[in-house]
Amino acid sequence: VKRSLPVVATLLAGSGFCALVYQTAWMRQFRLIFGASTFATAAVLAIFMGGLGLGSALLGRRADRHPNPLRFYGNLELLIALSAALSQPLLWLVGKVYIALGGSVTMGVFGATLVRLILATLVLAIPTILMGGTLPAAARAVTTSDDAGRRRLALLYGINTLGAVAGALASTFFMLETFGNRKTLIIAVLLNLLIAMIARAMTSGADVSSAPVEESSSALPARFVYASAAIAGFAFLLMELVWYRMLGPLLGGTTFTFGLILAMALLGIALGGTAYSLWSGGGGATVSGFALTCTLEAALLMLPYALGDRIAILANYLRVLGHSGFGGFLFGWTIITAIVVLPPAIIAGVQFPLLIALLGRGREEIGEHVGRAYAWNTLGAIAGSLAGGFGFLPLFSAPGCWLIAAMLLVALGLGAALYARNIPSIVIAACAVACAFALGPTALWRHSGIGAGRAETPQNPNEIRTWTNATRRMTVWDADGRESAVALADADDRSFIVNGKSDGAARGDAGTQVMGGLVGAMLHPNPRKALVIGLGTGSTAGWLGAVPSMERVNVVELEPVVLRVAQACTAVNHDVLHNPKVHISIGDAREVLLASRDRYDIVFSEPSNPYRAGIASLFTRDFYEAVRARLDRDGIFLQWVQAYGIDVETMRTIYATIGAVFPHVATWRTGEGDLLIVATREPVTYDLARLRQRAAAEPYRSALHATWRVESAEGFLAHFLAGDRLTRVVSHDALLNTDDQTPIEFGFARSLGDSSRFHMDQVIALAFGLGCAKPERMNGTIDWHAVLLQRAFEIDLTPVPSIAGADERVHHEFASLWDKSNFGGAMTVWTRNGRWMPVNSAEAAMVAESIVYSGAPDDPAPYLAMLRAWEPLEADVIEAAFRIRKGDRAAAIALLRRAFAGYRATAWPQPEIMGRGLALAKSVGAPAEMYAALEQPFAAAQLEELRLRTLYDLGRQIDHCGPRTLAALKRLEPWAPWQLELLQDRVNCYAQAGLHDLAAAAQNDLRDYQANMPEALAR
């Protein structure tokens, strides 16, 4: 037996490797069939884990009775390999059956969940039940009667889990990317067969029977041990969900992120099991030891909670390692994951073999003990997973569940400690409870965009507090939903944040969110039915629902909490939630497309970035084939693609994948850094008469002006970048993104630190070079020079000298200078080139502002009149500046009051212009009137931070430390802007007003600020 221990441990490591590869591949394949919702994932996970637990309980007892446990183990591995190989045709059959039944679209949530359970059982029951028996059989084969603490079992458990670590890392970081799902699973099957053959070859004759051994000295009833195993499993799986939810925003939310978290949790368990096996002393397990593991695990869980945002700040600083490439990012992620996950996972690894040792000594009934303990542990884990996903996370939030998991372990440990009269465990439990009173993770950790690379990098403690307070102050609310963590943030715009990354702003992203759908409606001859994938701010669905010919707009949204976002964005989305044409369903878009029988004129897909975990499945050839099947013959598919932070190979793969399904693929630009791929089965005819008619009719007229700041068919076509030919050229020899193999999921995530990026200018230059920069099929004539002039004021694009005419370069130079607030320079360009008439309202605003703010003698009236026809609030602000220049402050005050009142009703004026209006409010000489005009927020939280700071400045002008100053300061609490003058004002004003609690908090803040100021050279 002793001689076989190293070999059996090696075999069990391979078994753990295969099991994790199987689990990863199966979960990915089932998500493609059932969808990625929590309901679907939980059904599959419950069957997988349930099979393991049931197999452990049933086969553990049989392992004790088998004359040769090692042969029994080898037979199990052989059957696992065969049943895993059989899973592939079964998955194909399951997909056909589920789609034929109509999925959740037809069966509803309850019916679909029941069917998922049945179908998942068909595929997973046999292999998972067999897997559950491998550890009991191996333990029976190598454990000796003199092993009182069952340390050989612990070693096997640790080595088996170490193999699982290797499986998690290999599948996530190499196998799935290189081979795809099916080949990865086949490789695991072949390895499993090798393990089975080696195990069977090692066996000869019957196993040696064991001598009777004394009962465990734990004096604990077995039911307590099994209940403890269940509670520990519940707490650990609940905590795994918390780790995924909490670490995703810090590490980027990619497939690599979640694979790393899983591997780190398994590594901790492996190290803990191995450590237990090497524990000094030959005695058995004790209740005191178990109490110590529970309380220590709880304390180590709570330590990162108590550290709170300090861990987020560390994660932000570690992102600098990404400058060296993907390996640098991975190293930084590993540090953060190790800090949060590894210590409690190590203790959990000690805990499980200790529980089994409490049930008995040596090899007597070890198979049954392992089987039953594992079954109860797995049952608790299933309950923790289901409770966390369906109830606890949405109800208590991820930080709340963090506390619940730790307090469960504290309670379990205290119970055991009191039973064993173990004082150290009680002290450790008290430390864990004390950590619960810390502030814990805040919006800085969860919603500041650290993992997405959107966070600032502060250089000193006061800059850290500036960033910390601003992030917390701007977060209006956050919530943990079934699928994601969602937050609403008000800064310069109202934006929503999903799993740590901003997924859209009410006004700032309206060019894509509004026009992404309306481009299809403009081009389609008679749009009547549309499908929108992702609700977001509700803008796409709301504006499509406003199209007169549109009869129905179906929206599929995965996360129910996002409906709260749409409700908060009614100022920009045509009150989408109350539009009878718009029908919102909660579910997975893939499943809906595959299972429904509806047909559409327009399908618009704007998921999150494809490098984020699970999103790449909405960019696969299989998904696009499902879209094509749901489109009418002249239907239009619209795919948003980010043009920022993306590598060229990923962009080529996206083009190639769409082009493999749709023969006609055009490229549009909807906003800064946003591309729109317009894909059809038939070539699109651009009917200029129809385009002009629609550009002048609602809702197109308002949408074109509000989001793109154009007012004509020429302005609309200015956002067309390239036709079919570009797609064919770019797609040549590019990899395809398929359900089986998703290169953009892995390759894109790997390239995030790469300095060689794609830029939209590349599309423009290539389109001109290929001669496909204009639509190929046009009815009617158009002055393309006028189209290019409309594009010229898009300042984020760089006119390519070889393709841009002189006029375009001049207009672009003028717009660029205006964007930098260089109004004198802009005036020089404008006057030097003949004082041209603006091509649209946006350029009219630029000309008027340049005249007013540069002090030029030109009369802004003609340009203000042109602007006022489209955007009267902008005209009011610019005219107010002109009146101040002329000394007519009364007129300026009236204009500003009117502009601010109007800004509360509409979010569409340009923020740059309205921001200059807020600056005028402080200098116009009427602080009380301006204060009153700014007390209410603007529509969709436009310029909210600037408005609040302006109120404070105006309050100081009116009554320094008086009622209005106090009211303005309270609006900034409790996370006040970290600036010395304001911090001093808080102390003085609150003290004068007798607001002692606020004054004390303000004094502490001021003291912190001053303590972190640079020391003066001279004193």
Descriptions of predicted regions:
Residues V1-Q693, F748, D754:
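Alpha-helical transmembrane segments of multi-pass membrane proteins
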Residues I782-G825, E843-Y853:
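Alpha-helical segment of the N-proximal tetratricopeptide repeat
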Residues I803-H812, W836-M846, W870-I878, A905-G917, ...:
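Generic helix N-cap/helix-start motif at coil->alpha-helix transitions
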Residues L817, I851, R883, A921-V924, ...:
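Residue at a conserved register position within TPR or TPR-like alpha-solenoid repeats
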Residues W836-Y863, L867-I884, A891:
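Secondary-structure-rich domain cores
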Residues W978, D985, C989-Q992, H996-R1019:
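Terminal, low-structured helical/coil segments at or just beyond the last alpha-helical repeat
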